[in-house]
Amino acid sequence: MSCDEGKLFVGGLNFETTEESLEQVFSKYGQVAEVVVVKDRESKRSRGFGFVTFENPEDAKDAMMAMNGKSVDGRQIRVDQAGKSSNDRRGGYRGGSSGGRGFFRGGRGRGGGGDRGYGGSSRFENRSGGYQSSGSRDYYGRSHGSYGDRSGGSYRDSYDSYTTQE
């Protein structure tokens, strides 16, 4: 695992940035073991991101802190730990891909429990709990409420008055 600890994801790269220029920028922070700029298979052009692996994980941390948000070849780059970015950043990635938007919002705070209950009760709990209380009131609040009050109310009133008259 020490290999992954020293590995950084570098995103937002200029398409002209080469592995050599990236190594030059990052080698200030320590011994670089490997630099990879990910390229498109057919066009061989940079896809705008890559990986820099340091011999020492501490150097990688220093580089990440120092270089995140900095400009390289005229583009602001994003630097993250390679192993962690997919887990931390897309925390709900697994749940999100199979569970859809609503589930992702609800399942975020639950972690494992949300994933486990995906097909079961917590899915419906999220739907009714999340959608009913916040969905209909907050999100649709004005239009839904006024629509229901005006036409629903007047319709009901007139309907009730017909029933009581007869």
From Swiss-Prot:
Gene: cirbp
Organism: Xenopus tropicalis (Western clawed frog)
PANTHER family for the chain: TRANSFORMER-2 SEX-DETERMINING PROTEIN-RELATED (PTHR48034)
One BP annotation, GO: negative regulation of nuclear-transcribed mRNA poly(A) tail shortening
SUPFAM superfamilies: RNA-binding domain, RBD
Post-translational modification: Methylated on arginine residues within RGG motifs. Methylation by prmt1 promotes cytoplasmic accumulation.
InterPro entries: Nucleotide-bd_a/b_plait_sf, RBD_domain_sf, RBM, RBM3/CIRBP_RRM, RRM_dom, RRM_dom_euk
Domain RRM: 6-84
Gly residues bias: start-end ranges: 93-120
Record-level Gene Ontology MF annotations: enzyme binding; mRNA 3'-UTR binding; mRNA binding; ribosome binding
Function: Cold-inducible mRNA binding protein. Acts cooperatively with elavl1/elrA to stabilize AU-rich element (ARE)-containing mRNAs by binding to themm and inhibiting their deadenylation. Essential for embryonic gastrulation and neural development, acting to maintain the expression of a set of adhesion molecules, and cell movement during embryogenesis. Required for pronephros development.
Record comment regarding domains: The glycine-rich domain, which contains a number of RGG motifs, is necessary to regulate nucleocytoplasmic localization.
UniProt biased composition (Low complexity): 121-166
Keyword Lipid metabolism in record: no
Region annotated Disordered, chain positions: 68-166
Record keyword Ubl conjugation present: no
Subunit text: Interacts with prmt1. Interacts with elavl1/elrA (via RRM3). Associates with ribosomes.
Protein name: Cold-inducible RNA-binding protein
Keywords, in A-Z order: Cytoplasm, Developmental protein, Methylation, Nucleus, RNA-binding, Stress response
Protein's cellular compartments: Nucleus, Nucleoplasm; Cytoplasm
A GO-annotated cellular component: nucleus
SMART domains (UniProt xref): RRM, RRM_1
Highest rank taxon of the organism: Eukaryota
